[in-house]
Amino acid sequence: MTAQDYVVKDIALAAYGRKELDIAETEMPGLMACREEFSSSQPLRGARISGSLHMTIQTAVLIETLKAIGANVRWSSSNIFSTQDHAAAAIAATGTPVFAVKGETLEEYWTYIDAIFQWPDGNPSNLILDDGADATNYILMGSRAETNKDILSHPKTEEEELFFKQIQRRMEATPGFFTRQRAAIKGISEETTTGVHRLHQLQKEGLLPFPAININDSVTKSKFDNKYGCRESLVDGIRRATDVMIAGKTAIVCGYGDVGKGSAASLSGAGARVKVTEIDPICALQAAMDGYEVVNLDDAASSADIIITTTGNKDIVRLDHMRKVKDMCILGNIGHFDNEIQVAALQNLPWTNIKPQVDMITFPDGKRIILLSEGRLLNLGNATGHPSFVMSASFTNQVLAQIELFTRSGHYKNEVTVLPKYLDEKVARLHLDQLGIKLTTLSQEQAAYIGVTPQGPYKPDHYRY
């Protein structure tokens, strides 16, 4: 790494970041077990990983785990507000190129994603570790643009305009870059629901040129990170942002998937009266039987003190909903992108910045709303994201996926797949001792009776946990 091969807020924060990183390691047994298991064999020796995932303390432990088992890594954050600057500094100080600043502009965001593919020797990356599929989309859209520039001519949003401009800059600076980079990729591992959806769309359209491992639908990710992580980090973000008393407030959670379930539990545990909106009759019935009132936002918006979106879809909270809410209603998103709330529809109204990632927006009738993290992930923008322990499970999946893709790339087709069940169970097993969990062991007779081995896997792939 050259002296300039990183962009962080302040490299002097490295010592502070290192102290927190050391603490996080004690709460991330899965990642530490990976270091112990694979440090000798170095299965990622020769891997050149371009990582785009929230640059937090927990991600720093992931990065150092990948490096400890042989990988070379370049990193950016997957959200303009999610970087923890001391974490980025701690990683940069070790010689790992990292490009991440809390509060970076959208233009900088795409510049930093480009930077994770710019290795000093000029050779391409061979793996992508992604969150939201932005890094993957950058390479694939760029390679398409190298054969047809017209696809960059009509951006639909401000962010897409900046995205296209970055592609154009790279095409001019390095002709053929995207096509060469696409051809070198052995595979990608994707962290989130939103990113997995994008990858499935690419596969459906015949535009996925390499294998993709869906981390999100590993049981030890979706049923833990998405649910239990949100259960802790949502209320943390709201409290740090607003200092409001949540108990007694009426909160509406839009969506009751795994993230919605965790979010509803988070608010309910803080004493809020929680209502849920849903499009899916199965999830709606689950919410009702968990004790929540299931409502339509058109009807219920006026009752809300807090509205949280969790869906991964767009236009969930529209301008007409925001006109109905109570004065000083808190709006936040814990889904993925900033279009779950129609933030663009608010741009012509007066904004007052209260503090970083907290804005008050005033309507013509004098009503005010509090918007958290400009509609982006509030648990990372207004707080520090999920706790280390639950992220250890998610990130252990990432490490195992990167090893699979690098060492067994011929085993996977150019499609979206999940890690095999035995690895999912391995991830869970690595986290049991930390919580003092003692497993019961099947006898040979019991195992034969249900058609498994005493060592597992214990459930068929179609089992729903």
Swiss-Prot record:
<keyword id="KW-0554">One-carbon metabolism</keyword>
<feature type="binding site">
    <location>
        <begin position="334"/>
        <end position="336"/>
    </location>
    <ligand>
        <name>NAD(+)</name>
    </ligand>
</feature>
<dbReference type="InterPro" id="IPR042172">
    <property type="entry name" value="Adenosylhomocyst_ase-like_sf"/>
</dbReference>
<feature type="binding site">
    <location>
        <position position="278"/>
    </location>
    <ligand>
        <name>NAD(+)</name>
    </ligand>
</feature>
<feature type="binding site">
    <location>
        <position position="313"/>
    </location>
    <ligand>
        <name>NAD(+)</name>
    </ligand>
</feature>
<keyword id="KW-0520">NAD</keyword>
<feature type="binding site">
    <location>
        <position position="221"/>
    </location>
    <ligand>
        <name>substrate</name>
    </ligand>
</feature>
<dbReference type="InterPro" id="IPR015878">
    <property type="entry name" value="Ado_hCys_hydrolase_NAD-bd"/>
</dbReference>
<dbReference type="Pfam" id="PF00670">
    <property type="entry name" value="AdoHcyase_NAD"/>
</dbReference>
<feature type="binding site">
    <location>
        <position position="191"/>
    </location>
    <ligand>
        <name>substrate</name>
    </ligand>
</feature>
<feature type="binding site">
    <location>
        <position position="131"/>
    </location>
    <ligand>
        <name>substrate</name>
    </ligand>
</feature>
<feature type="binding site">
    <location>
        <position position="56"/>
    </location>
    <ligand>
        <name>substrate</name>
    </ligand>
</feature>
<dbReference type="GO" id="GO:0071269">
    <property type="term" value="P:L-homocysteine biosynthetic process"/>
</dbReference>
<feature type="binding site">
    <location>
        <begin position="255"/>
        <end position="260"/>
    </location>
    <ligand>
        <name>NAD(+)</name>
    </ligand>
</feature>
<dbReference type="InterPro" id="IPR036291">
    <property type="entry name" value="NAD(P)-bd_dom_sf"/>
</dbReference>
<dbReference type="GO" id="GO:0033353">
    <property type="term" value="P:S-adenosylmethionine cycle"/>
</dbReference>
<comment type="pathway">
    <text>Amino-acid biosynthesis; L-homocysteine biosynthesis; L-homocysteine from S-adenosyl-L-homocysteine: step 1/1.</text>
</comment>
<feature type="binding site">
    <location>
        <begin position="192"/>
        <end position="194"/>
    </location>
    <ligand>
        <name>NAD(+)</name>
    </ligand>
</feature>
<protein>
    <recommendedName>
        <fullName>Adenosylhomocysteinase</fullName>
        <ecNumber>3.13.2.1</ecNumber>
    </recommendedName>
</protein>
<comment type="function">
    <text>May play a key role in the regulation of the intracellular concentration of adenosylhomocysteine.</text>
</comment>
<feature type="binding site">
    <location>
        <position position="225"/>
    </location>
    <ligand>
        <name>substrate</name>
    </ligand>
</feature>
<comment type="similarity">
    <text>Belongs to the adenosylhomocysteinase family.</text>
</comment>
<dbReference type="GO" id="GO:0006730">
    <property type="term" value="P:one-carbon metabolic process"/>
</dbReference>
<dbReference type="GO" id="GO:0005829">
    <property type="term" value="C:cytosol"/>
</dbReference>
<keyword id="KW-0378">Hydrolase</keyword>
<dbReference type="InterPro" id="IPR020082">
    <property type="entry name" value="S-Ado-L-homoCys_hydrolase_CS"/>
</dbReference>
<dbReference type="GO" id="GO:0004013">
    <property type="term" value="F:adenosylhomocysteinase activity"/>
</dbReference>
<keyword id="KW-0963">Cytoplasm</keyword>
<dbReference type="InterPro" id="IPR000043">
    <property type="entry name" value="Adenosylhomocysteinase-like"/>
</dbReference>
<feature type="binding site">
    <location>
        <position position="379"/>
    </location>
    <ligand>
        <name>NAD(+)</name>
    </ligand>
</feature>
<dbReference type="Pfam" id="PF05221">
    <property type="entry name" value="AdoHcyase"/>
</dbReference>
<feature type="binding site">
    <location>
        <position position="226"/>
    </location>
    <ligand>
        <name>NAD(+)</name>
    </ligand>
</feature>
